[in-house]
């Protein structure tokens, strides 16, 4: 077991790196606002479309199907994020780990079939 001083010595470089990263990120976000000149006019507030006059308002509505596909993508992308570490450690986790992941996949497959049957994937 590591003592407090040893633990501090182990994690001090990580804490310093994290602190510097937060400081640099904050500076990168704040400095342009402080140093730039702010001259707003009608042309700068318009959306830019490759040098042409805008055809319509840039704030157009999207069909709900796009949001649904995005949410389904995130859910099944997270499935892959869980599957990769499981596949790497498959030899060491034994039967309990195997059947837990099979149950997890079963629940996801049931959810996918439900979405399919409800017509969420039909356009």
From Swiss-Prot:
It is found in: Cell inner membrane. It is an enzyme of class 7 (translocase). One of its GO terms (cellular component) is plasma membrane. It is a multi-pass membrane protein. Its main location: membrane. The chain crosses the membrane at residues 11-31, 64-84, 93-113. It comes from the Bacteria. Belongs to the complex I subunit 3 family. NDH-1 shuttles electrons from NADH, via FMN and iron-sulfur (Fe-S) centers, to quinones in the respiratory chain. The immediate electron acceptor for the enzyme in this species is believed to be ubiquinone. Couples the redox reaction to proton translocation (for every two electrons transferred, four hydrogen ions are translocated across the cytoplasmic membrane), and thus conserves the redox energy in a proton gradient. This is NADH-quinone oxidoreductase subunit A. It comes from Rickettsia conorii (strain ATCC VR-613 / Malish 7).
């Amino acid at each position: 077991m590591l003592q407090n001083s040893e633990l501090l010595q182990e994690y001090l470089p990580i804490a310093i790196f994290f602190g510097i990263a937060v400081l640099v990120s904050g500076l990168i976000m704040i400095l342009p606002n402080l140093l730039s000149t702010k001259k707003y006019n009608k042309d700068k507030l318009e959306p830019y479309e490759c040098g042409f006059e805008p055809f319509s308002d840039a704030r157009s509505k999207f069909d709900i199907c796009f949001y649904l596909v995005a949410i389904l993508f995130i859910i099944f992308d997270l499935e892959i994020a869980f599957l990769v570490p499981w596949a790497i450690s498959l030899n060491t986790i034994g039967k309990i780990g195997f059947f837990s992941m099979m149950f997890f996949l079963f629940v996801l497959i049931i959810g996918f079939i439900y979405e399919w049957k409800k017509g969420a994937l039909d356009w």
